[in-house]
């Protein structure tokens, strides 16, 4: 992976920090910030995180039975191939991202890692000469800023609760600055981008 790092650092000279992240059982990203000079060592040797980091509750708190019963031993987080990507921030592309997956001390997949569980499921399909295909849709709501020290409820009360104007292009144009930034973020990380539509609710958008 040395060539991968060299090409990345050359293409993004402003990157000073990398998010080395792994996804826990709730789909929340956990991990460490890694300085630019440590990227190669992380790709070569991985990094340690407690195995219990993948079993936190949704609030990020330890589950005592997981964290303390075995002394909260470490797992080894190894880089997922081709996952070193730039991250678009308000300052530009001055940050990177590296997706990790956890193995145990023998190098075997740690089955508390959702990514490893999914890999095992895919193995079953492969053994049957099957290839699952899927499409992901990101749905979200855009809410007015209620202002400092004001409850969000005030913004909701001001909205037209009837909604409507389904698939309206002018509604997308109204939020074009934010939606253009979203599109650029997808492009920066080489993520598939098929388009955006306005849903039925006044503030409901789908990508």
Located regions from the model:
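Conserved small/polar residues in nucleotide/adenosyl-binding loops
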Residues: 203-207
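Active-site-proximal, well-structured secondary-structure segments within enzyme catalytic domains
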Residues: 195-202
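ATP/Mg2+-dependent ligation/transfer catalytic cores
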Residues: 1-195
